[in-house]
Amino acid sequence: MNSKIEIKPGRLTLAELRRMAKAPVGVRLEEKCKGKINASVQTVGEVIRQGRVIYGINTGFGLLANTIIPNEELEHLQRSLILSHAAGVGAFMADSTVRLMMVLKINSLARGYSGIRLEVIEALVQLLNAEVYPSVPQKGSVGASGDLAPLAHMSIVLLGEGEASYRGQRLSGREGLELAGLSPITLGPKEGLALLNGTQASTAFALQGLFAAEELFATAMVSGSLSLDAALGSRRPFNPLIHAVRGHKSQIDVAASYRQLLEHSEIERSHKFCEAVQDPYSLRCQPQVMGACLNQIRNAAEVIGTEANAVSDNPLVFCKENDIISGGNFHAEPIAMVADNLALAIAEIGALPERRTALLIDSHMSGLPPFLVDKGGLNSGFMIAQVTAAALASENKSLAHPASVDSLPTSANQEDHVSMATFAARRLLEMADNTAGILAIELLAACQGIDFRAPLKTSPLLEEAKSIVRQVVAFYDQDRYLAPDIKNAQALVQAGAFNHLVSRDLLPSFNR
């Protein structure tokens, strides 16, 4: 496990969250947050002693909020809440998703507005540091009142119930606790609700979608530049004068990055004074399209970063005011909307490379051998690889349909508008996988095209990119089993093998 990250409640950075998403990282709580945590517990105790009726502390839940629960049943109320709400279905989330969800929940609870004891938060920290991850089904949340079912499955392990995993091994919840050196916890008033209310599952998926979108974006900048050179496209549309007069910062930044990637290309110099006037849009309009995508990524990073540090519990404990107030911070509409926008960006990041691959295999458009292989007819080359890219791009168009407008009332109409944020964010991972496949195919096609331009070379940065590809996939001199080549190139995309070739200032979590 890597060195520990100190959780300063409400101040987790995207760079820290990226680290946690990629590999197990130990955490510890900042010492000075503990006083506020303890004070919130004292406030809950004082409210109970005063005999005040507060939702979720001494009442039922949802439509049953008007049912008053006697003090001697308050512990049972919290246990029952978690058991009944652990009702998710489907395949379990990846450990990386659960790891993020746990970190986000710890971060939120540690801000001291939830009335949950320090020992419960520390138990989550201990589970996380032991790499014992609750087994959480992917489906069952509508993103309001928070991610109830996923967080119940996360929390049920603290009771010694449910299931967990440890380095690929499936365990019972009790076995997971023992492995982490813990015993089952008896929850106090409000603690079950504090664990369950929140947007941490939706936000964990959204973070993973954001990080994947950034890596796809970086790769698409590289693969698009390779395709431009392979097709003898012009750099003139990337001239800063063009982008300055439009004024969109992300477009300006993207155009600058393209210029940097293409600088000192021998191929480009060889046709600098050719008669071609305008390239097809998939080459010429890359700064405009990718700039718009970058704008969505940057906006999503801002919103998701805020939500990752938010208190999304209900009700909230305000110690200074000696008050506990019911509200709606559990409603994940901000995540749902930015996830929808990220879906559009991921689809568009994949749409351009599919079109460029189609251009490269068309000898009339690219001037390269048909389907990028010698002895066409005997060899089919990249013919069906482009069909695969088209299939993936089309699938992404369907997956990009907005989820945030698709509300359904729940809990006997008490919860009559919900966000659907969990699905909105979860489908980003499938879309990102599709786009990684499209980019893998473009990388192979573009590198093939560059090799056909030998002895001329592309730019130094793009030669480095081609070298990365050629380390795992050889030149395609005749037809061979192509699926493993695509898989190997896709693994490069998903590992962020090309991230270092674009400016670290371009993408949000690369530089925070």
Swiss-Prot record:
Which Gene3D superfamilies does the entry link to? Fumarase/aspartase (Central domain), Fumarase/aspartase (N-terminal domain)
* UniProt PTM comment: Contains an active site 4-methylidene-imidazol-5-one (MIO), which is formed autocatalytically by cyclization and dehydration of residues Ala-Ser-Gly.
Sorted alphabetically, which InterPro entries does this protein's record hold? Aromatic_Lyase, Fumarase/histidase_N, HutH, L-Aspartase-like, Phe/His_NH3-lyase_AS
- Reading the lineage from the top rank, the first entry is Bacteria
CDD domains xrefs: PAL-HAL
Q: Which organism is it from?
A: Desulfotalea psychrophila (strain LSv54 / DSM 12343)
Q: What class of enzyme is it?
A: lyase
Q: Name one GO molecular function term.
A: histidine ammonia-lyase activity
Hey, which family's this protein in? Answer: Belongs to the PAL/histidase family.
Q: Which Pfam families match?
A: Lyase_aromatic
Q: What is this protein called?
A: Histidine ammonia-lyase
Q: What is its main location?
A: cytoplasm
Q: Which reaction does it catalyse?
A: L-histidine = trans-urocanate + NH4(+)
